[in-house]
Curated annotation (Swiss-Prot):
The keyword Nucleus applies. Residues 154-213 bind DNA. Residues 88-126 are annotated as: Disordered. This is Homeobox protein Hox-A6. Belongs to the Antp homeobox family. One of its GO terms (cellular component) is nuclear speck. PROSITE patterns: ANTENNAPEDIA, HOMEOBOX_1, HOMEOBOX_2. The gene is Hoxa6. It comes from the Eukaryota. One of its GO terms (biological process) is anterior/posterior pattern specification. Sequence-specific transcription factor which is part of a developmental regulatory system that provides cells with specific positional identities on the anterior-posterior axis. Its main location: nucleus. InterPro entries: Antp_homeobox (IPR050296), HD (IPR001356), HD_metazoa (IPR020479), Homeobox_antennapedia (IPR017995), Homeobox_Antennapedia_CS (IPR001827), Homeobox_CS (IPR017970), Homeodomain-like_sf (IPR009057). SUPFAM superfamilies: Homeodomain-like.
């Protein structure tokens, strides 16, 4: 059994009388791994309490410490912006990156939703729905200068007139019970109505006027008859 360090409990010479060769063995041969420690159960350690490390281990440990220290010592000024990342050309990224060339995000920043991006997406979605939504006939405005848009089927709704429109139509009917096409167009443009609506209103107004005149004439005729009978 050979050992890499001297054990004082083990005799310095063999029973066969040969010379002591344990002291001639090198403590650290060429195949010794400096990174792997040996347990203390092999014997009392007479070597000084010193750690032998290789230069490559120093370089590796420094880079590891730099990475760990950089993740805690970075402030707000060390973060890269999106413009810096997007402006960098891909051809210029051939050099090896250091530990500080990468972005560092906290878990809250990684999983936190971006309110501005979501608000912009919702706004664009709302505008798309606004222009692509179908317009049904019942959604159109009936009192419009361009005319009411009705469906190809179904019953047309009854037109309602404002007090101003009714007053102006009554004035026109008082002077002219029948309108020419030119005058009808002028009134339609002035009252924000269609020619058809003006035409229908005058037709209904003439029917009402005829009924009123017939009722007046009938009452006058009945009154004259009663007076004639009373005179006899």
């Amino acid at each position: 059994m050979s050992s890499y360090f001297v054990n004082p409990t083990f005799p310095g010479s063999l029973p066969s009388g040969q010379d002591s060769f344990l002291g001639q063995l090198p403590l650290y041969p060429a195949g010794y791994d400096a990174l792997r420690p040996f347990p203390a159960s092999y014997g009392a350690s007479s070597l000084p309490d010193k750690t032998y490390t290789s230069p490559c281990f120093y370089q590796q440990s420094n880079s590891v410490l730099a990475c760990n220290r950089a993740s805690y010592e970075y402030g707000a000024s060390c973060f890269y912006s999106d413009k810096d990342l997007s402006g960098a050309s891909p051809s210029g990224n051939n050099k090896q990156r250091g530990p500080g060339d990468y972005l560092h995000f906290s878990p809250e920043q990684q999983y936190k939703p971006d309110g501005s991006v979501q608000g912009k997406a919702l706004h664009e979605e709302g505008t798309d729905r606004k222009y692509t939504s179908p317009v049904y006939p019942w959604m159109q405005r009936m009192n419009s200068c361009a005319g009411a848009v009705y469906g190809s089927h179904g019953r047309r709704g009854r037109q309602t007139y404002t007090r101003y429109q009714t007053l102006e139509l009554e004035k026109e009917f008082h002077f002219n019970r029948y309108l020419t096409r030119r005058r009808r167009i002028e009134i339609a443009n002035a009252l924000c109505l269609t020619e058809r609506q003006i035409k229908i209103w005058f037709q209904n107004r003439r029917m009402k006027w005829k009924k009123e005149n017939k009722l007046i004439n009938s009452t006058q005729a009945s009154g004259e008859d009663s007076e004639a009978k009373a005179g006899e």
